[in-house]
Design a protein with these regions (language model features):
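Ubiquitin-like/PB1-type beta-grasp interaction modules and other compact soluble beta-rich domains
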Residues: 1-79
């Protein structure tokens, strides 16, 4: 599964062995894997993730994932 972290999320990844600082990486999709599991595995605080995209479709944190999926995680964006 392809995972992409946007904006400041790559620097927020704190899990040991995570791809800290990398915006794109691959993880193995296992049976029953949901978006929330991936967020936990890479160590990104779930409250930092505002938008979840799976294969170009906006989904929630409890969406099931499969091998070959493309997961994009986006933080809230602000500015003026």
């Amino acid at each position: 599964m392809d995972v992409r972290l946007y904006a400041h999320l790559p620097e927020a990844a704190t899990a040991p062995g995570s791809q800290r600082g990398k915006a794109e990486f691959q993880i193995e999709a296992r049976s029953g894997l949901i978006v929330r599991d991936v967020i936990r595995e890479v160590g990104v605080p779930s409250e930092a993730v505002f938008i979840v995209m799976v294969n170009g479709e906006r989904l929630d944190l409890d969406a099931c994932l499969a091998d070959g999926d493309r997961l994009g995680l986006f933080p809230a964006v602000s500015g003026g």
